């Protein structure tokens, strides 16, 4: 009876329910009690969404290409036999000028991939975040798309905009002690179409950027031999970390080794 629904939001294609679960936490370490009935609150968000009305053409995953996939299991008339197919997870980009695209020329997509940048970010962070997102346009040009991805501020005069609506992919500011930039995306399990993505940048991201740059470059870069991270180095690191997570949000797997 201590848990309750905090908010319910309804949109055109999804609903979001925020719930606060309250517990009395008891914990032990090495059989020794370390906490007894400590009041604890855990916030959980549930989202239910309709799948797109139009179905994107599936593409079977090629193991030679680092693309995320969703598993699809099918059964034939022999109920004891099943087949697993891995469907590539990707954004549904459609060229505006199909004729030019087929001739190998660049074309803008009908609907570009758009990430909205949280208003809660410090102003001096935003340009690095925008650069980290739009850096991927160079890669999309190799696939024939011009200005395929963009980063915009939260709309100020659009009363229909809500960051909890899956119609909008957002880069969110997280006021926590965490240091690592993370991401997630939502894909249609039937087709693999990515329909929403989120990138989360914590307030203490600068601590991780400092450690990475100090360990990797302090021996040759005198500006890193200090306890204070220079703003230009912070921007460089933030751009890299955002670009990395946006890449994952595009359905790309880590290129490790």
What are these regions (language model features)?
Residues 134-137, 192, 236, 240-255:
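Active-site recognition of the HExxH zinc-binding catalytic motif
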């Amino acid at each position: 009876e201590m848990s309750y629904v905090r908010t319910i939001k309804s949109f055109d294609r999804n609903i979001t329910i925020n719930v606060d679960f309250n517990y009395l936490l008891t914990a032990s370490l090495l059989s020794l009690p370390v906490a007894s009935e400590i009041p604890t609150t855990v916030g959980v968000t549930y989202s239910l969404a309709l799948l797109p009305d139009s179905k994107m053409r599936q593409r079977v995953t090629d193991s030679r290409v680092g693309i995320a996939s969703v598993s699809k299991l099918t059964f034939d008339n022999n109920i004891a036999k099943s087949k697993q197919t891995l469907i590539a997870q990707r954004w549904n980009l459609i060229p505006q000028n199909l004729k030019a695209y087929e001739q190998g020329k660049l074309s803008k997509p009908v609907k570009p991939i758009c990430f909205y940048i949280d208003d809660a970010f410090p102003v001096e962070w935003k340009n690095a975040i925008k650069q980290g997102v739009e850096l991927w346009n160079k890669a999309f040009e190799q696939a024939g798309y011009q200005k395929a991805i963009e980063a915009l501020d939260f709309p100020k005069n659009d009363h229909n905009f809500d960051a909890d609506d899956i119609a909008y992919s957002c880069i969110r500011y997280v006021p926590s002690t965490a240091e690592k930039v993370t991401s997630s995306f939502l894909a249609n399990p039937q087709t693999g179409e990515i329909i929403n993505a989120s990138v989360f940048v914590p307030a203490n991201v600068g601590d991780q950027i400092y450690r990475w740059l100090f360990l990797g470059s302090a021996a040759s870069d005198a500006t890193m031999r200090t306890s204070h991270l220079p703003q230009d180095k912070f921007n460089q690191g933030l751009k890299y970390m955002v670009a990395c997570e946006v890449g994952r949000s595009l359905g790309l797997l880590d290129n490790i080794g």
